[in-house]
Each structure stands twice: as structure tokens, then as C-alpha cells.
């Protein structure tokens, strides 16, 4: 996070010293790819820096010259949240000055150019927040994987081909009761780790292992320094609060 902030500030410094208007705009364009919690948080934070914090710091450009884009291939940002909260998050971002682009797929990233199915954006500041590929170790297991390279696992977190090999966290595709894979977030990995560790220590055979059950305590996405949306258990809420983001 600190490296990203440093690179953002360096981009403004480059823009200040650049005489060519087109090149300067390249430094002032910021593109975040991926409308999940990480992408939303980054876009909001960048917008606050670009449109509020540096307004009086430079002479050769002003805050109106900066452009912050958030690109999401799906129909809405934050798809893990309800449509209502997703819409609120979009409104919050747009009020901060972020240009939110949904239903727009990134087809290629060239040097300083983001190519989508709807056009191009020239930028020296391109941040990928659209997810990660699973660990290359999964390929060596020679087991069933999904489209993202994650191991498709049983209800006891073991792989399909060997009940003594376990895969957890964002390297695994564990389907919940609705048939949807659990998100690749820390709480899932922590709970799976405790579950698997307990079975290993107790040397529980597969036919006696209780299925893993994830206890969802809620998720939250921050939007800039003073806005957030969250889901706590089955209750939905939107918050206005101070944060350290």
C-alpha cells in the first residue's frame, strides 16, 4: 500500500515537471482494474489524493486534470454484496470523482495503454486488482482444477484424488451449500486451516471427518477515508465513519 501511494505521488511530481500536455495527462490518469473490495478501496483512496489532498501542491495542473478510472468486467462493482449496496458504493465513488466503468472487459494491457472491448485509456498508472492466479504448486498435484487454476476440493478440504492431501484458502475451490465457491479471503483460509489442522493432529479418517462449515462473520469494503459498506451476518448496512485507509 505504501509503495502504491509513493508511486501515485511520484506520478504527480512527473506531471508537474512535464511540459508536453499529452504526456502530462498520461501521468494524471489512474486506472484500477477490478471492481472487488481491493479495487474499490484503491480507486477511492487515489481519488481522495488526486482531487482533494494535492489541490494546492502543484502549479502546472489542478485537481480537475486528474482522471481516476475503475474498470469492472461484470455488470456491477462489488458483486459479493447485494445490488443495493453495490449501487451505493458506486454512488460514493462517483461523488469522489471516480469514473466507474462496468460491463467493460480488459482485453490487453500494453505499455501505458489499457485496451478494453470498448476503447483505450492511456495511463502511466495501471493497477491490477482483478484477482490472482492460484499457486503453481496446484498444477503439480495432477488433480481437478477450476478455470482459475484452483484445486476443486471435497467437503473435508481434501483433493479429489487423495484424501490425505489438503488444499485451503485462495488455492482451493470449496463450494458452499448453494454450490458457490467460497471467496479467497483471509477468514476462509484461517477457518479452513484450523479445521484441517485439527483433523491432521487427530488423524481422523476421511469417512469420519465432519464437513467443513464456514462461519461468515461479514465483509466490508471501504471507499475513501470516510465511507464504507458492510455485510454483518445477514444484516446489510452502509456506514459513514473515519478510517485509516
What spans do the regions from the language model cover?
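FAD-site-proximal beta/loop scaffold in flavoenzymes
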Residues: 1-20, 112-113, 120-191, 198
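Internal hydrophobic alpha-helix adjacent to the cofactor/substrate pocket in enzyme cavities
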Residues: 188-214
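Conserved small/polar residues in nucleotide/adenosyl-binding loops
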Residues: 237-243
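Glycine-rich dinucleotide-binding loop and its adjacent helix/turn
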Residues: 1-38, 47-52
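A Rossmann-like FAD-binding core segment of flavoenzymes
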Residues: 47-155, 161
Amino acid at each position: 500500500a505504501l509503495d502504491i501511494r509513493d508511486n501515485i505521488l511520484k506520478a504527480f511530481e512527473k506531471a508537474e515537471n512535464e511540459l508536453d500536455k499529452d504526456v502530462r495527462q498520461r501521468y494524471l490518469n489512474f486506472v484500477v482494474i477490478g471492481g472487488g473490495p481491493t479495487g474499490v478501496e484503491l480507486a477511492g483512496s487515489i481519488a481522495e489524493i488526486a482531487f482533494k489532498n494535492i489541490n494546492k501542491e502543484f502549479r502546472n495542473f489542478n485537481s480537475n486534470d486528474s482522471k481516476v478510472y475503475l474498470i469492472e468486467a461484470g455488470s456491477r462493482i462489488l458483486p459479493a454484496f447485494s445490488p443495493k449496496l453495490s449501487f451505493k458504493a458506486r454512488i460514493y465513488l462517483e461523488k469522489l470523482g471516480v469514473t466507474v466503468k462496468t460491463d467493460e472487459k480488459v482485453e490487453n494491457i500494453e505499455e501505458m495503454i489499457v485496451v478494453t472491448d470498448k476503447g483505450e485509456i492511456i495511463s502511466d498508472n495501471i493497477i491490477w486488482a482483478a484477482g490472482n492466479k492460484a499457486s503453481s504448486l496446484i498444477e503439480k498435484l495432477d488433480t481437478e482444477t477450476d478455470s482459475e487454476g484452483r484445486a476443486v476440493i471435497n467437503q473435508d478440504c481434501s483433493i479429489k484424488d487423495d484424501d490425505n492431501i489438503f488444499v485451503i484458502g485462495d488455492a482451493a475451490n470449496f463450494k458452499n451449500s448453494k454450490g458457490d465457491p467460497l471467496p479467497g479471503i483471509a477468514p476462509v483460509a484461517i477457518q479452513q486451516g484450523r479445521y484441517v489442522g485439527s483433523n491432521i493432529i487427530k488423524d481422523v479418517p476421511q469417512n469420519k471427518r465432519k464437513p467443513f462449515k464456514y462461519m461468515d462473520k461479514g465483509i466490508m469494503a471501504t471507499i475513501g477515508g470516510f465511507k464504507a459498506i458492510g455485510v454483518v451476518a445477514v444484516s446489510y448496512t452502509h456506514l459513514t465513519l473515519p478510517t485509516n485507509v
